[in-house]
Amino acid sequence: MLKGRLVRYLHHGIEFLGVLVEDGAQGGRYGLGANLIAPLDTTNDMMEFIINFERLGGIKPSAPQVSLDEVKLLAPIKSPLQDPICLGLNYLDHAKESMRFKGEKDSKLENPVYFSKRVGFFSDPNSVFSKGRFTNQLDYEVELVVIIGRDCRFVSHSEAMDYVFGYSIGNDLSARDIQLKHKQWYAGKSLEGSFPLGPCIVLRDSLDAHNLTIKSFVNGELRQHSSTANLIFDIPTVISELSGYFTLRAGTVISMGTPSGVGMGFVPPRFLEVGDVVSCEIEGIGILDTRIES
């Protein structure tokens, strides 16, 4: 069984990996419901930890524990080995609002839509995203992120979940005007720093990833509210299909798509402005905040 919640954090200027101490706390920073972190004594590199999980002997917390209030949480993975794999239009309600925005006819997808997002680094919880001068239509997308734990190739649907390491929250920040300009998603979804990730990685057997409430807020106003039960294509389907096309390496990040309620879905659209704070929340994982600056 893979259980627990892992974090990457900065304490007195030094990076550590740790496991959250399940002490029954409610709420708290980052919505984690925990006050203490037990450092891991193996490595401070989460990608190395994932890839070599069995060789490193799994989770081995050490003493002394530190308070969550004394540290700065970092993105649980500093940077991906390869660009993350993303799913587009994987909630029916979001597929409909996206097609309305583009003036296309509503329809349900028969097959998953896959794309990649250029990511040199994952942005930390409570980080600032600078939207720059290239977009006036910056949008938010709360997403369940799946992290692969072992290399997999030609994996069946029934075996697929055995290859999952854990889950996190991603915000797929997207420049809609750049997407429309280039008539595809890659550039508009790849602005520097446009993939905040965190606040932790919840190990696979700690929750039911297909029955989680998923929400986003802008300045405290609820914008997105759905459940991962509404995914059109579930996690085993995605892993099984992709592993047939190519090897999914340990540490691969897969972002499962977003529900309706994004800025472009409103009439008129409600895109992000300088000073806005986006809060992405998934039940059992936590809260991921990002502030928008110029």
Predicted regions located by residue number:
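Structural signature of FAD isoalloxazine-binding scaffolds in flavoprotein oxidoreductases
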Residues: 103-124, 140, 273-284
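Non-heme Fe(II) oxygenase catalytic core, chiefly the N-lobe of the double-stranded beta-helix
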Residues: 124-160, 165, 170-174
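Short catalytic-site patches enriched in acidic/histidine residues
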Residues: 113-131, 153, 193-200, 259-264
